[in-house]
């Protein structure tokens, strides 16, 4: 259900007890979103990963409008895709992604998968493996 929320969010995943199988991956979590499933969120989002095997990390909403900044920090674990914004919709703020360990198997986008980013993107990578890197959106 769509709604309007005003708050900051914090999501953290510290790991799992199994080894990922690259041929038939089993994910600790399929998708992590820093924001809402839909609707409007006014506030900043924070997603932290220090271990585990995650399919997708989105700093913002799955859909809808986020007014605030998004922050994604990865210090360990394995992620397939990282997007600083959301899956779709609009982010009225800045996105930042810090990867200081672990690996990103398929890519990082500073913006959204598709939608509108009304701010700046910042990506910092240190001591990590990343397949590909895009400063803006994945599609449009």
Where are the predicted features?
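Surface-exposed loop/turn motifs in large extracellular/passenger domains
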Residues: 1-56, 62-81, 87-107, 113-132, ...
